[in-house]
Amino acid sequence: MSLVHINVMLAFIISLIGMLMYRSHLMSSLLCLEGMMLSLFTMMAITVLNINFTLASMTPIILLVFAACEAALGLSLLVLVSNTHGTDYVQNLNLLQC
């Protein structure tokens, strides 16, 4: 396993740990989720380039499109929650009240 693979996996693990530890604000959760998606994109692009599989060459771009859609939806939910509740604390959100 090369040093690049180890660094990308370490970036994913750090983002996952950040997602688990810093859950108090919605913005920090979205940033950690974005870091996870970016490391998945990098790992998938490296894997597709290494195996020279031409049919899977669009897979990293499709993942990047889904990551952009996820970021847009997350930011719109952040704006909606901060406008209605006045804060972005995850603990203040209750599914029965929203």
Swiss-Prot record:
Recorded superkingdom: Eukaryota
InterPro entries according to UniProt: NADH_UbQ_OxRdtase_chain4L/K, NUOK/Mnh_C1-like
GO molecular function per UniProt: NADH dehydrogenase (ubiquinone) activity
Annotated TM spans: 1-21, 29-49, 61-81
Keywords: Electron transport, Membrane, Mitochondrion, Mitochondrion inner membrane, NAD, Respiratory chain, Translocase, Transmembrane, Transmembrane helix, Transport, Ubiquinone
EC number from the UniProt entry: 7.1.1.2
Membrane protein topology class: Multi-pass membrane protein
Reactions accelerated catalytically: a ubiquinone + NADH + 5 H(+)(in) = a ubiquinol + NAD(+) + 4 H(+)(out)
GO cellular component: mitochondrial inner membrane; respiratory chain complex I
GO biological processes: ATP synthesis coupled electron transport
Location relative to the cell: Mitochondrion inner membrane
Biological role stated in the UniProt entry: Core subunit of the mitochondrial membrane respiratory chain NADH dehydrogenase (Complex I) which catalyzes electron transfer from NADH through the respiratory chain, using ubiquinone as an electron acceptor. Part of the enzyme membrane arm which is embedded in the lipid bilayer and involved in proton translocation.
PANTHER family named in the record: NADH-UBIQUINONE OXIDOREDUCTASE CHAIN 4L (PTHR11434:SF0), NADH-UBIQUINONE OXIDOREDUCTASE SUBUNIT ND4L (PTHR11434)
Family: Belongs to the complex I subunit 4L family.
Quaternary structure note: Core subunit of respiratory chain NADH dehydrogenase (Complex I) which is composed of 45 different subunits.
Protein name, as recorded: NADH-ubiquinone oxidoreductase chain 4L
Originating organism: Phataginus tetradactyla (Long-tailed pangolin)
